[in-house]
Amino acid sequence: MTKETETTCSFCGKSQDEVGKLIAGVDGYICGECIDLCHDLLHDEETREQQSAEEAVETEEKLPTPHEIRAHLDDYVIGQDYAKKVLAVAVYNHYKRLRSNHGIADVELGKSNILLIGPTGSGKTLLAETMARMLNVPFAMADATTLTEAGYVGEDVENVIQKLLQNCDYDTEKAQRGIIYIDEIDKITRKSENPSITRDVSGEGVQQALLKLIEGTVASIPPQGGRKHPQQEMLRVDTSKILFICGGAFAGLDRVVQKRIHKGSGIGFDAEVKGKEDEVSLTDLLKQIETEDLIKYGLIPEFIGRLPVVAPLSELDEKALVQILTEPKNALTKQYQALFGLENVELEFTPEALNAMAKKALERKTGARGLRSIVEGALLDTMYDLPSLEGLVKVVVDEAVINEHSAPKLEY
């Protein structure tokens, strides 16, 4: 005769002798130890959900107003008041949309992707970077001239999403709240207003490839930067939640706008002699940009439709460049002074030197971007010798250092 079957816990398999009590269910038993374990697991899950909810509420509370966004941009970017205001409103509306969509019935809020138009070194990239840093969201940057359609040699447009994922350790939720800045967007314009019969791999074709990405699609991205293959599990990223900012110099676009405004007046834009007063009006001219102007320039209508917010930036003058050198929180002169301070040496730039640097940047037509190379060139030899110079107290950079490549004055 066989031994009577011993009653055991259906979860852990322990006998009644080992656990003391078993609670009977319809088709099985559970012991006190397993009940405690289940309770702990459920409690941990509840705690995690509560923490996530609290973090979400905390994040929502931290969404800065357009005034606060503008004030923060003022700390790091000189001038460009109109562009800052446009950006502040667009960014606020975008993140408000993400946080409020679940509570809006029968209304779908559109995306506020942004097009920045301004000359080299006017602050387009800095504005985008500063906003991402302020909002504490992932940021990625791409150069439109390196992008090609899928299947061609070059960088696939979806690689832009991969860069964003890399910058937030492949956390898709974080990536979907990020900002992507695509520079040199004016370099992928088509060469004529008529659709091309031949394939345009790096121009109109790239605009077409970017369309869905910018408007909103679910992109499949290989994990950890691998290549796509059929059996691979992909990361799915909803790009409708990502804010896209496109920037470009759009040289000559002002002529297109001027031609439209003064159509039939018989006065050619090229015939005008532009003085200082006219230069101010060029910024106002770019505020009047319409879709037809961008189409004439070479952007396709569908692409323009995905960038509803247009923010023009003005060219920086000498005064603005001097302010950029000295006033922002991370101003170039402050950075180099901090660097010299690590060697217990004071670094001084004379007002004449600052003006000379600004003039040189204007001559090179590099805007604020060219200032760092000018300062670096002026201080290279001094920085090379600095750790070896005992007793050095102060370094003075004057106008001669910038214009005549003289050595800075050393004070011991």
Swiss-Prot record:
List positions binding ATP. P119, T120, G121, S122, G123, K124, T125, L126
Pfam families listed in its UniProt record: AAA_2, ClpB_D2-small, zf-C4_ClpX
Q: Which residues form the ClpX-type ZB domain?
A: 1-50
Enumerate the residues binding Zn(2+): C9, C12, C31, C34
List cellular component terms (GO): HslUV protease complex
Superkingdom is Bacteria
Does the keyword field hold rRNA processing? no
Question: Which UniProt key words apply to this protein?
Answer: ATP-binding, Chaperone, Metal-binding, Nucleotide-binding, Zinc
> Which terms does the record give in the GO molecular function aspect?
ATP binding; ATP hydrolysis activity; ATP-dependent protein folding chaperone; protein dimerization activity; unfolded protein binding; zinc ion binding
BP GO annotations: cell division; proteolysis involved in protein catabolic process
Query: Keyword Signal: yes or no?
Result: no
Q: Record's CDD domains?
A: RecA-like_ClpX (cd19497)
Family, as annotated: Belongs to the ClpX chaperone family.
Subunit (UniProt)? Component of the ClpX-ClpP complex. Forms a hexameric ring that, in the presence of ATP, binds to fourteen ClpP subunits assembled into a disk-like structure with a central cavity, resembling the structure of eukaryotic proteasomes.
This chain's function reads: ATP-dependent specificity component of the Clp protease. It directs the protease to specific substrates. Can perform chaperone functions in the absence of ClpP.
Q: This protein is called what?
A: ATP-dependent Clp protease ATP-binding subunit ClpX
Tell me the name of the encoding gene.
clpX
